[in-house]
């Protein structure tokens, strides 16, 4: 079994149970989860891995070419909205615990990171990430981008570079990944995954982890195709993944 070792600073996580919020350290959360779940073993699938990489390169390059007018138009709209950079980048944790810089269209005001600490008490996500309804940091253009998932399109560059895959567990920032088991890092992170099409941020942290582990166990070209199809349906139905 392949293992991944991470060494990040300790943080504190909040767990909701009804109206009760309990504070746990990362070590407590990890210890409790690992005690209830066996680590996932990564099965060797060399043929699948080669085909997956080829399809990632071909599909991401084709998508960038096809959507280039849209990408340029979105970039211009963001700059006109508040004169800031259209691209937002952030360090995320990828395969084998390696850091990489993820790209997105900027959907928030330029001081969004500085304002996040003041909003932590309003976090509605049951998973590892941060989400609140009517986030005041989101711009008018950004609201449209998020509703249509267009803000994620620059990650096609990450896929082309090899940092990510089209399908795989979503990558988190170091402090968030610290709260999660390392075995979800056995494969490349993806643009979409099981839990994004099966409940998204409404799922609990353990449910998201279970679905990531399910993908690692079931990964195949057919599984990837099914997730891609359901992701497209979610986007066109107005459900933000």
Predicted segments, located by residue:
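N-terminal hydrophobic signal-anchor/signal peptide
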Residues: 1-65, 217, 239-241
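Hydrophobic alpha-helical segments characteristic of transmembrane helices
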Residues: 22, 32-33, 153-159, 197-198, ...
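Short, glycine-rich, amphipathic interfacial segments at transmembrane boundaries or analogous
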Residues: 24-28, 88-136, 192-211
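Short glycine/proline-rich turn/loop motifs
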Residues: 35-45, 120-125, 135-138
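A hydrophobic, helix-centered structural microdomain
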Residues: 43-113, 183, 221, 226-241
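A short, structured surface patch at a secondary-structure boundary
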Residues: 128-188, 227-235
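Cytosol-/stroma-facing membrane-proximal "stalk/adaptor" domains immediately downstream
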Residues: 178-184, 188-241
């Amino acid at each position: 079994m392949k293992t991944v070792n991470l060494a990040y600073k300790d943080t504190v996580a909040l767990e909701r149970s009804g109206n009760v919020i309990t504070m746990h350290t990362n070590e407590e959360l990890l210890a409790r989860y690992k005690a209830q779940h066996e680590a996932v073993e990564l099965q060797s699938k060399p043929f699948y891995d080669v085909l997956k990489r080829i399809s990632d390169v071909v599909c991401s390059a084709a998508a960038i070419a096809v959507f280039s007018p849209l990408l340029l138009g979105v970039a211009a709209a963001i700059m006109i909205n508040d004169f800031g950079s259209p691209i937002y980048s952030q360090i995320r944790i990828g395969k084998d615990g390696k850091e990489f810089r993820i790209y997105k269209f900027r959907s928030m005001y330029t001081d969004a990171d500085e304002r996040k600490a003041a909003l932590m008490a309003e976090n509605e996500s049951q998973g590892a990430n941060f989400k609140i309804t009517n986030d005041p940091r989101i711009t008018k253009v950004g609201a449209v981008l998020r509703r249509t998932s267009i803000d994620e399109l620059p990650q096609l560059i990450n896929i082309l570079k090899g940092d990510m895959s089209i399908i795989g567990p979503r990558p988190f920032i170091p402090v968030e990944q610290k709260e999660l088991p390392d075995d979800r890092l056995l494969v490349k992170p993806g643009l979409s995954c099981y839990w994004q099409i099966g409940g998204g941020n409404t799922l609990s942290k353990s449910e998201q982890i279970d679905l990531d582990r399910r993908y690692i166990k079931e990964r195949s070209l057919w599984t990837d195709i099914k997730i891609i199809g359901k992701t497209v349906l979610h986007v066109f139905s107005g459900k933000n993944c």
